[in-house]
């Protein structure tokens, strides 16, 4: 086992991880529920950055809660899928390297 190659590989992985974090911060995902009455947006880090609620829901608290939960769960699932895909892309590139 060549430890110098392992160190080089580790540096490459760390550099790619930094690049992914920067890219994730700049990505935006949105999900709608209730035929678009509620829209939630999140960045690639999973931080909610915007919520839009149609005025017609303001007097129906229960429906608003249900639609918010649905939109939040959907957008967070999108973020998780994207993060997983990006991580697989990075780690997949190192699978064939012989140490």
From Swiss-Prot:
Alphabetical list of InterPro entries matching this protein: YbaB-like_sf, YbaB/EbfC
Domain of life: Bacteria
Classification via NCBIfam families: DNA_YbaB_EbfC (TIGR00103)
GO molecular function, one term: DNA binding
Record's subunit section: Homodimer.
Assigned GO CC terms: bacterial nucleoid; cytosol
Similarity section: Belongs to the YbaB/EbfC family.
Protein's organism: Campylobacter jejuni subsp. jejuni serotype O:2 (strain ATCC 700819 / NCTC 11168)
Protein name from the UniProt record: Nucleoid-associated protein Cj1642
Keyword Ribonucleoprotein appears in the UniProt entry: no
């Amino acid at each position: 086992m060549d430890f110098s190659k392992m160190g080089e590989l580790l540096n490459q992985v760390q550099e790619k991880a930094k690049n992914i974090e920067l890219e994730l911060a700049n990505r935006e995902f949105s999900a709608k529920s209730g035929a678009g009455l509620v829209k939630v947006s999140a960045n690639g880090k999973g931080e909610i950055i915007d919520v839009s609620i149609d005025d017609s829901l303001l007097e129906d608290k229960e429906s608003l809660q249900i639609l918010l939960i649905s939109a939040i769960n959907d957008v967070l699932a999108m973020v998780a899928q994207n993060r997983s895909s990006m991580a697989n892309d990075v780690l997949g590139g190192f699978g064939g390297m012989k140490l």
